[in-house]
Amino acid sequence: MASLRLFSTNHQSLLLPSSLSQKTLISSPRFVNNPSRRSPIRSVLQFNRKPELAGETPRIVVITSGKGGVGKTTTTANVGLSLARYGFSVVAIDADLGLRNLDLLLGLENRVNYTCVEVINGDCRLDQALVRDKRWSNFELLCISKPRSKLPMGFGGKALEWLVDALKTRPEGSPDFIIIDCPAGIDAGFITAITPANEAVLVTTPDITALRDADRVTGLLECDGIRDIKMIVNRVRTDMIKGEDMMSVLDVQEMLGLSLLGVIPEDSEVIRSTNRGFPLVLNKPPTLAGLAFEQAAWRLVEQDSMKAVMVEEEPKKRGFFSFFGG
């Protein structure tokens, strides 16, 4: 029987074994001292080395989608916090004009007193607009505007570039990562958000409307000079793929032609974590979606990717990270 398997492009895979369940542990010898032991599922943060940062710093990454509601802001929160937990300094910029939500997902909404607008107008210093997460002091949030507010005339990509340059030259040092949460759509807000970026993470779901928008956004990113584009496929359900009611990850990859950074399973815990302002990657015990976000962050650090391939094998029980079709 043919099935779809996902592998890291690095020969030392980050993927979970095919026998994964909530009672088995991640058994890659790269990270686990004794892979034969059984224990509750563990976070990748318990592995025995820190990912090696590739590329020049700061890495300026825009997380975008085109279509709204595919999990772009959820991805920003979880990948950003995972990077901070790996030990890298991170500034996340919510570039959604008047409709910011990243502060809610991070549980920081009551601590945002100033935004980029006040910094640009000279009403506050940049360090006053940055909100430092109390859980991880190397993670900071910067909001572009207040909810339902309008940006001043002339605010655009150049202004955001100025803010990014200010982050690079601040007295306490440049962050390792600047993560920009891009608004949905392809209007002026999108153009503003992608202007300072030199790499992009495209979030999509395995449905035809999201993929058409993602394909359009890919073209716009390339026209803007962003060639390093990786993809996260979100809200994947293996039961629907096996029933041929949802496109497989391989189908998505073939349609968009992008490097695969991560595959995130459908997870009801996302709604609970959003309402609590407590990202999935902080859950104990971790969920499969939380682990998938952590692994995507690891690949982002090392500029690694996943590869979907068809293999022939005998029918057997399969886990989420090793089976995406039938």
UniProtKB/Swiss-Prot annotation:
Any one Gene Ontology molecular-function term assigned to this protein's record: protein homodimerization activity
This protein's UniProt keywords: ATP-binding, Chloroplast, Membrane, Nucleotide-binding, Plastid, Plastid inner membrane, Transit peptide
GO CC, any one term: chloroplast
One GO-annotated biological process of the protein: chloroplast fission
Result for mutant: residue 72 to A: Impaired interaction with MINE1 and loss of ATPase activity, but normal homodimerization
Main location as per UniProt: plastid
InterPro entries reported in the protein's UniProt record: CobQ/CobB/MinD/ParA_Nub-bd_dom, MinD, P-loop_NTPase, ParA/MinD_ATPase
Compartments, record wording: Plastid, Chloroplast inner membrane
Gene3D superfamilies hit by this protein: P-loop containing nucleotide triphosphate hydrolases
Chloroplast among keywords: yes
A Pfam cross-reference name: CbiA
Induction of its expression: Accumulates during seed germination, at the beginning of rapid greening.
Phenotype on disruption: Heterogeneous population of chloroplasts in mesophyll cells and petals, with normal and larger plastids, due to reduced chloroplast divisions and asymmetrically constricted chloroplasts. Contains highly elongated and multiple-arrayed chloroplasts in developing green tissues. Formation of some FtsZ rings that fail to initiate or progress the membrane constriction of developing chloroplasts. Normal shape and number of etioplasts in cotyledons.
Transit peptide, UniProt annotation: 1-62
pH dependence (record): Optimum pH is 7.5-8. Active from pH 7 to 9.
Positions bound to ATP: 67-74
UniProt keyword Ion transport present: no
Regulation: Stimulated ATPase activity by MINE1.
UniProt membrane topology term: Peripheral membrane protein
Function: Together with ARC3 and MCD1, regulates FtsZ ring positioning in chloroplasts in an ARC6-dependent manner. Calcium-dependent ATPase required for the correct placement of the plastid division site. Inhibits FtsZ filament and ring formation in the plastid. Mediates inhibition of plastid division. In cooperation with MINE1, prevents FtsZ ring formation anywhere outside of the mid-plastids.
Subunit: Homodimer. Interacts with MINE1. Binds to ARC3. Interacts with MCD1. Interacts with CDP1/PARC6.
Similarity comment: Belongs to the ParA family. MinD subfamily.
Protein's name in the database: Septum site-determining protein minD homolog, chloroplastic
Protein species of origin: Arabidopsis thaliana (Mouse-ear cress)
Gene name tied to this protein: MIND1
